[in-house]
Curated annotation (Swiss-Prot):
Pathway: Pyrimidine metabolism; dUMP biosynthesis; dUMP from dCTP (dUTP route): step 2/2
Keyword Magnesium: yes
Positions that bind substrate: R66, S67, G68, N79, T83, V84, D85, K93
Enzyme Commission number(s) from the entry: 3.6.1.23
Record-stated family: Belongs to the dUTPase family.
Keywords, ordered alphabetically: Hydrolase, Magnesium, Metal-binding, Nucleotide metabolism
Catalytic activity, reaction form: dUTP + H2O = dUMP + diphosphate + H(+)
Protein's organism: Rhodococcus erythropolis (strain PR4 / NBRC 100887)
Organismal lineage: Bacteria, Bacillati, Actinomycetota, Actinomycetes, Mycobacteriales
Gene: dut
Record protein name field: Deoxyuridine 5'-triphosphate nucleotidohydrolase
Length: 164
């Protein structure tokens, strides 16, 4: 694919590397921590990455957890994926959470803590209407398609709340 998008990037911390892909063709680039921090079990903290970017209108940056860190230590992102809008020009920060119930996680300056994926997006105009067209799904929401025993509302002890 020769249609590469160029994105302006400002290094706010010159000692940290410019975000890079771990392998050619990877969708995400790694983001690094600007500081040392310990995240206690069940706690969260906002961590800087030392970069700011200028995304073009019609694109979005999505900050995802690193799968290896999530699997091995329980480190994730509170609002995964984090959304970076095209108009934002501040430092990219990541709200990390330690999902491990017992062990603290030590982050060191320069550690790769998240991935940034840039995607093109539609910018639709919403039109208010009196009613929506009917579909086979209708208003079926959370759990309505089944596929797991816990979603069976006839099971003993099953609780289905309002608006679910």
């Amino acid at each position: 694919m020769s249609d590469h998008l160029s994105i302006a990037l400002k290094r706010l911390d010159p000692d940290l590397p410019v975000p890079q892909r771990a392998h050619p063709g990877d969708a995400g680039v790694d983001l690094c921590s600007t500081s040392d921090v310990t995240i206690e079990p069940g706690h969260r903290t906002l961590v800087g990455t030392g970069i700011a970017i200028a995304l073009p209108v019609g694109t979005v940056g999505l900050i995802h957890p690193r799968s290896g860190l999530a699997a091995k230590s329980g480190l994730s992102i509170v609002n995964a994926p984090g959304t970076v809008d095209a108009g934002y020009r501040g430092e990219l920060k990541v709200c990390l959470i330690n999902l491990d119930p017992a062990t603290a996680i030590d982050i060191r300056r320069g550690d790769r803590i998240a991935q940034l994926v840039v995607q093109r997006v539609e910018l639709p105009v919403f039109e208010e209407v009196e009613s929506l067209d009917d579909t086979t799904r209708g208003t079926g929401g959370y759990g309505s398609s089944g596929g797991h025993a816990i979603l069976d509302t006839d099971a003993p002890g099953a609780v289905v709340g309002e608006g679910v």
